[in-house]
């Protein structure tokens, strides 16, 4: 399965702000070229209503054991331009746990995406995990682009391109969290346009010597 270009490694939970903006600008430039190329395609009939785009991206991570760590990052950005609107986003969640008792460590991570009103959706998703006698880890990451070309729609409905890596692989992991129980989560959402919406929700919970949990969502509409 080919890996999409310039995806960020899940090892870095928080990237520098200018990196995010540069990625957003590159995808905007791609959308402008793409929208111009398809300008002469099939159009809606005159008088038909135009609906905007809305996208929700998020995920969660949980770890159980004496020492646990969960991290989450959600980013969602939207812009309404002349002739098209575009939304880009990602979600990266990781969990790791360690226990002195064999089989006492568990870890899970997952991501999700829901998009409405887009003509084209490109989504890349990957999940992995490891399980050893005294430790466990899991990671899940998702990247996507959603594009709506105003006054045009694909004849057969939205075009969705999904790129996936194989599912979880459980094997001795070697991942060891720091002593203690930690939970870190960040969510960012931003939208630009005449009628727009952006919102985020985050939760983080730790229980000493037992558990760590994070979840987050980012919502944008244009």
Where are these regions (language model features)?
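Low-complexity repeat regions of mature extracellularly deployed or surface/particle-associated proteins
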Residues: 2-222
